[in-house]
Amino acid sequence: MGKYNLILSEYLSFIYNSQSAVQIPIYYSSNSDLEKRCIEFHSKCLENSKKGLSLKNIFLEYKDVTENATLLSILSYSYDKYNAVERKLVHYAKGKPLEADLNANELDYENNKLTSDLFPTAEEYTDSLMDPAILTSLSSNLNAVMFWLERHANDTAERAKIYKRRLDLFAIVASTVNKYGVPRHNAKYRYEYEVMKDKPYYLVTWANSSIEMLMSVFSHEDYLIAKELIILSYSNRSTLAKLVSSPMSILVALVDINGTFITNEELELEFSNKYVRAIVPDQTFDELKEILDNMKKAGLVDIPKMIQDWLVDCSIEKFPLMAKIYSWSFHVGFRKQKMLDAALDQLKTEYTEDVDDEMYREYTMLIRDEVVKMLEEAVKHDDHLLQDSELAGLLSMSSASNGESRQLKFGRKTIFSTKKNMHVMDDMANGKYTPGVIPPVNVDKPIPLGRRDVPGRRTRIIFILPYEYFIAQHAVVEKMLIYAKHTREYAEFYSQSNQLLSYGDVTRFLSNNAMVLYTDVSQWDSSQHNTQPFRKGIIMGLDILANMTNDAKVIQTLHLYKQTQINLMDSYVQIPDGNVIKKIQYGAVASGEKQTKAANSIANLALIKTVLSRIANKYSFVTKIIRVDGDDNYAVLQFNTEVTKQMVQDVSNDVRDTYARMNAKVKALVSTVGIEIAKRYIAGGKIFFRAGINLLNNEKRGQSTQWDQAAVLYSNYIVNRLRGFETDREFILTKIMQMTSVAITGSLRLFPSERVLTTNSTFKVFDSEDFIIEYGTTDDEVYIQRAFMSLSSQKSGIADEIAASQTFKNYVSKLSDQLLVSKNVIVSRGIALTEKAKLNSYAPVSLEKRRAQISALLTMLQKPVTFKSNKITINDILHDIKPYFVTSEANLPIQYQKFMPTLPNNVQYIIQCIGSRTYQIEDDGSKSAISRLISKYSVYRPSIEELYKVISLHEQEIQLYLVSLGIPKIDADTYVGSKIYSQDKYRILESYVYNLLSINYGCYQLFDFNSPDLEKLIRIPFKGKIPAVTFILHLYAKLEIINYAIKNGSWISLFCNYPKSEMIKLWKKMWNITSLRSPYTNANFFQD
C-alpha cells in the first residue's frame, strides 16, 4: 500500500522545495480511539506549522497514528510564487534547440512556424489546431519528467541506461522549450495568444507528445524510435505517423505461420500446428521498398533501418519490434486540420464518367437486398419497435449538440443551449415539434459540422444533423443491428464475440491453397462516388419493404427513413472560414447519422461481394469467409491448386483493377498468411493490436473533470500496456497526483492518498496494482467507502430548476403516457432520472455539480465523516465471504502457446495456464427472459440496475410492472408463475455481479473464467440449493486466484466451507447491492 504515498511525499518535497513549504499528512482510522488521536495529531501539526516550528517531535509523539492509521491526504502549502519549472528546466537544457523546417508540410498552417507568423493578430488566433485538450499543463508534464529524472539520477546497471536514454531525450525537449520559455496555461488549461505569439505554434502539443514518448523509453530500440519521432515530429505535423505506420500492411504478409490458433465449431480458440508459407511476389517487395524510400526521404534513418534488418529473415520472434514501431508512430499526437481542408479533402477526388455501370448496379442491388433481408422479418410481423419508432427514438435521444444554439425557456429560467434533448422539450412546449417532417439540409439550411481527429490520418468531418434525423433512423437501425448481431460477416456486431474470435476466423482457413484479400475502404466510404449508389440502394430497399406491410405506422417509419436518405442526397455543409461561413455542396457520406456504422458495414459487404463476383469470372475459388469490420473488409479465398507467387500477383492486380473500375480509391492487398486492418493485425499466425492511445494529448474537450481525466489517463495507460506500449508507471502515478490534487487557496493544496484513489468508491481513479481490481475488505477501506458514499450524489440548482419547470415535466409525462398502459412508478421515475441526467452535458449544470463535489471532497479529505449507510456494496459481500476461505499452494503447468505476443508477462502467464476467452460475458441482463418479454411488447429497455431491482420485488409487483409496459396479462401471469422466473432471478443477479466486478474490462476480458484448470483449484462443498451463493463464492475464488497469479506468478488453491446458516443471510444481502459509478468505471466504459 505504500508506493503511491511514498512517491507523493517525495514529489511534494520536489515541487515545494523552499524553506516556507510545509507538508502535513492527514490520517484517519475506523477505530474511534485511534481516530481521536488522528484529529489531535492534525491540529497539532497545523498549530506548529503556523508558528513555523518543526513537525518532527509531533511525528514521534504520535507514532501510533503514523504506524496504524491510514493516510487520507497530504495538505501542502508554500508561500513561494513558484516559477520552479523554468528554474529547474535550465539544468536540463544543455542541448541544441530544434529548428523547425518551415516547408515540411503541404498546408502552411501545419508548419511549426511562430504563432505570430501563422496568426498575425489575437483576433485571428485559434488554439483549435494545437490544443492538447487535456486538463493538465505542459509545466506539470515537465515537472513530472524532472521529478522522475531527479529520483533516478543514481540508478545503477540496466536502470542507469534507461535513465541515460531518457535524460538524453529530455535534453532535446528541455532545450527547445527553454529557448522560447515555458508557455503558461490559463485556468482552463488553454494557451492564449499572448503566451504563444513569440513561440512555435505546435510547441505545446509537440512537447506533450515528446514527454509521453520519452517516458515510454526502456530499451535501446525504444530510444532510437523515440529520438527519431521526437525530432521529426517537431517539423512534420502532417504525415509522419502515416509514413511510419504504412509498411505494416505489407509486413504482415511476409511472416510464415508455424503453429497458430483457429476458431473451432464451438467458437473457442484451439491450437493448430499447421505451417503456412508466406508467398510474396516481387511486386510486393518493390512496393515495400518504395515505402521505405519515402521514409528515408522524410528524414527517417533508424526506423527504416530496423525494418530492413528485420526483412533479412522476417521472423515472428523479432516481429514485436515491428509492432512496436507501428504503435509508437501514433504517439506523435493528433493531426488537427482546419475544417475547410478536412471537408475539401473528400471533394477533391476527380469525378470520372468512365466507370463500370454494371458493377455499380450490382453494388446498389446488393445494398438493396441486404437492407431488405435485415428488416424483412420485422416489417412483415409489424414489429412494435417499427410502429412506435418515434417513442423509441425519443427515449434514446442523446444530449449531444443539435447544431445551433437556441434560447430556451424552462419555467422562469431562460437559457441558451445547443443540446438535442433540450430542443426537443422546447419544441414540444411550443408546438413546434413535428417528427413527421424531416427538415431539408440543402443550400437554405446547410449542416453544421463536428470533427474527428486521429493520429496519422486526416481530420474527418461529422454531420451534426437536426434531431429529427435521429428519431427517424433510430428504430430501423436498431433492427438492422439485431440482424447483424447474428450474422458472422459483421465482425464488429457479431453476438458477444471479441477480437480474438475474429482472429481465429481468419487463421482457420489459411493454408497453402488459400489467400486472404484485405482492403481498407475508409477512402471509399467518404468518397463522392459512393453517395448516389449507396443512398439509392437503401431507398430501393425501403421501397420494397414498404410493400410488405399494410400497417400505416410501419409504412410511416419506413417513409421517414427514406426521406432522410433523399434529403441527404442533396446536402450542403456550413464551414466557418475566418469570419465568413462558407456553404459547400457536399456530395459524400459523412458520419453523424445514426445509420453510419450499420450502413457502412452493409455497403462494404456489398462492395467486397461485387469485387469477388468479378474476380470469380477469371479464377476458380471458394470464398471461405467474408468479413467487414468498420472501414475494413477481408475475405479468405480457397483455390483448388497450391498458391504460387504468380497467382498472388495476378489476383492482387486484378482486385486492384476491379476496384479501379468503380473509381474506388482503396488500398487492397493480397497475402497468404496475415492481414492488417484498423482494429488489429495478424502476423505469423499471432494477433497484434495497435497500442496507439495518446496519453498527454486528447482529441477534444468534453465536460469531464480533472479527476475523470486522471482515470482516463490511467485506463489508457493500461490498454496501451496490454497492447505492448508501456509508459513508466511512476510517471503515470505522478500525473495522477497532479491531476487529482485540489487547490484550496493559492498557496494551499490537498493531495488525496492512494487509499482514497484506489478504493472503489465514487472517487476511484486507478488500481494500486496494474491489472488487478481490488475490492477492499479491511475496516478502514469499508469505512472510507461508506464515508464517500454519503457525499456521492451532488445536487445542481439549475438542473432542479429545469426539472421543476412545466416544459420538462410535460415532456417526461408525455413519454411515460405513450410508453405505459397503466401506472408504473419505477419506469416513470427511471425516465425522469434519465432525462435529468442528460442535463449534465449542459455546462452550467456540470460546473455546478463539480463545485459541489469539490467542496464536499475538501471536507472529506480533511476529516472523513462517519456515515452509517444501509447500502451494501460489493465490498461488503466479499468482506463477509473472505474469512471462510482457506488458501494453500498449488501448481498449474503452462499448457497453451502464446498467441498475443505483446501482452505483459504476468498476464501472458495466466492465459498460458488457464486459456483465453473468445466471448463477452453477458453483463446487461439482455439474455434474461424478462428482458426478452419486455422487448417483445415494448420499446422500453430497462438497465441491468433496474432489472435487478424489479426481479427482487414481490411477484404481484413484477406482474404489475410487466402489464404496465403493455405485456398482455396472460403472458405476465405465465411468466411470474413459471420456473423461468426463478431462473431469471439467478441470471440477472449473475449479470449484475459480473457488471459490478468489471469482468469484461481491463485484462479480465482475456481470461477464461470457466476454465476447468481454474475450477480444479477451488473446493467448495455443496450445501443446499442457493445457486446465487454458490456463484458468488466461486467467482470470488476465481478472482482471488487470478489476482494472486498476476501478482506473484504462481498459483494457489482455495477451500471454502461456508456455513449453511450464513448462506441465507448472504443471499438476502445480495439483493441490496448498490452499484458505484466512479471516474474509474466511466473510463473503462469509455474504452468500450
From Swiss-Prot:
Keyword Nucleotidyltransferase part of the UniProt annotation: yes
Reported cofactor(s): Mg(2+)
Record GO terms (molecular function): nucleotide binding; RNA binding; RNA-directed RNA polymerase activity
Alphabetically ordered keywords of this record: Magnesium, Nucleotide-binding, Nucleotidyltransferase, RNA-binding, RNA-directed RNA polymerase, Transferase, Viral RNA replication, Virion
Record-listed E.C. numbers: 2.7.7.48
GO cellular-component term (any): virion component
Catalytic activity: RNA(n) + a ribonucleoside 5'-triphosphate = RNA(n+1) + diphosphate
GO-annotated biological processes: DNA-templated transcription; viral genome replication
Domain spans labelled RdRp catalytic: 501-687
InterPro entries according to UniProt: DNA/RNA_pol_sf, RNA-dir_pol_4-hel_dom, RNA-dir_pol_luteovirus, RNA-dir_pol_reovirus, Rotavirus_VP1_C
Compartments reported by the entry: Virion
PROSITE patterns associated with the record: RDRP_DSRNA_REO
Similarity annotation: Belongs to the reoviridae RNA-directed RNA polymerase family.
Function: RNA-directed RNA polymerase that is involved in both transcription and genome replication. Together with VP3 capping enzyme, forms an enzyme complex positioned near the channels situated at each of the five-fold vertices of the core. Following infection, the outermost layer of the virus is lost, leaving a double-layered particle (DLP) made up of the core and VP6 shell. VP1 then catalyzes the transcription of fully conservative plus-strand genomic RNAs that are extruded through the DLP's channels into the cytoplasm where they function as mRNAs for translation of viral proteins.
Subunit description: Interacts with VP3 (Potential). Interacts with VP2; this interaction activates VP1. Interacts with NSP5; this interaction is probably necessary for the formation of functional virus factories. Interacts with NSP2; this interaction is weak.
Designated name of the protein: RNA-directed RNA polymerase
Organism per entry: Rotavirus A (strain RVA/Human/Japan/AU-1/1982/G3P3[9])
